[in-house]
Amino acid sequence: MTTPAIRSQVPLLHVADVARTIRFYDRLGFVVANSVTANDGTLQWVWLVAGSTSLMFARTEEPVVPGAQRALLYLYADDVAAMHAHLRAHGVDVGPIQTPFYSPRGEFRFADPDGWGLIVAHT
């Protein structure tokens, strides 16, 4: 018997406010591909896409503690310096561009409003 193929993987992260998350990830070029809204009008879930990258976010009733999140999203961009400048211009607290041995063209780190860590590196 052969194992059925898995086509892709999409991270699903819990957040306190889906609408706030959409606004934040818009700064990175993500757009809404799909969403679910509760009867009261509150966004409960969203699927965001940017190029071939997909992320899903779902509202949680549990406390979301910034800085305590355990996942790290590694995003690839064509121009790290331009993305760094763009995010700073939009009020995102980004770390400095660094050039570790595994990313000689540079990368930088920051966090989203719920504390999920992100790294942007060159493609």
Residue ranges: model-predicted function:
Residues 1-3, 7-17, 45-49, 64-123:
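Vicinal oxygen chelate
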Residues 38-40, 64-65, 100-102:
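A short beta-turn/loop motif at secondary-structure boundaries
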Residues 1, 62-64:
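Short, flexible, solvent-exposed loop/turn segments with mixed acidic/basic and small polar residues
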